[in-house]
Amino acid sequence: MEAGDFIKDAIANNKIVLFMKGTAQFPQCGFSGQVIQILKKSGLKDIATINVLEDEQVRQEIKEYSQWPTIPQLYINKKFIGG
């Protein structure tokens, strides 16, 4: 699957998607870790996380998809919330 299709599919099929560096259990940047903590403290569940460090194409494509240059990037109900 192409990176763009993977991103569109992830956003379409999950209520909450976080494109981040690392995983929810082991964030690999401070900002990604902060977003995870905020989401958990807010009581949100079923958060799909995508580790952009595992796929350089996804890492670059998500920036183009959102027209936003930084990661993490949070989508809720298919809407880009921010990064």
Which stretches of residues belong to each language-model region?
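Local sequence-structure signature of Cys/Sec-based thiol-disulfide redox active-site neighborhoods
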Residues: 7-46
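Structured beta-strand/turn binding interfaces of compact recognition modules in eukaryotic regulators
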Residues: 19-21, 50-55, 77
